[in-house]
């Protein structure tokens, strides 16, 4: 059985979303999207954005470093404990939260369309690539895991 790449489809997702995020913030800073700027909510959006970024960093550290994700992938092991018990794709979630946080800090409502598009893009990429591989590799164990744990948004496991 072919092993999954340690990076998976991650670089495609992260690099493309990062480029879009940077360009969007640049465009907003150049006053092309002024109608979406909400100056009266700036402090609140900066706070929420900072929380999202912090959550993303914690998720990444927990998934990659604490749970030795690279070793598990190399050993064809399905991670279902620790941070993986509350979200199936904590590394993707981490980048999603960091990018969303950066967009929130800009305090421009037009930019808040992007996290929705990023979520759709991530869902499609995962379903077409990594989730197929995981299903082929782990079968019923992966199906049960999917029924209990969210793909992207951390939450308490379903019973």
Regions found by a protein language model. Name each.
Residues 1-80, 96-159:
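Membrane-anchoring alpha-helices and their flanking helix-loop junctions
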Residues 79-89:
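Short, amphipathic, aromatic/basic-enriched membrane-interface segments that mark the entry/exit
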Residues 88-97:
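Short hydrophobic alpha-helical membrane-embedded segments
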């Amino acid at each position: 059985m072919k092993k999954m790449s340690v990076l998976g489809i991650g670089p495609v997702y992260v690099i493309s979303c990062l480029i879009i995020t940077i360009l969007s913030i640049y465009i907003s800073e150049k006053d092309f999207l002024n109608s979406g700027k909400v100056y009266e909510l700036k402090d609140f959006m900066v706070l929420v954005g900072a929380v999202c970024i912090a959550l993303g960093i914690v998720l990444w550290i927990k998934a990659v470093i604490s749970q030795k994700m690279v070793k598990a992938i190399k050993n064809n092991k399905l991670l279902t404990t620790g941070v993986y018990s509350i979200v199936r794709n904590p590394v993707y979630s981490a980048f999603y939260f960091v990018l969303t946080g950066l967009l929130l800090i800009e305090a421009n409502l037009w930019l808040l369309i992007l996290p929705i598009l990023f979520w759709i893009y991530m869902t499609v990429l995962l379903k077409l690539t990594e989730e197929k591989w995981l299903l082929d590799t782990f079968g019923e164990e992966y199906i049960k895991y999917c029924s209990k744990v969210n793909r992207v948004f951390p939450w308490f496991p379903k019973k």
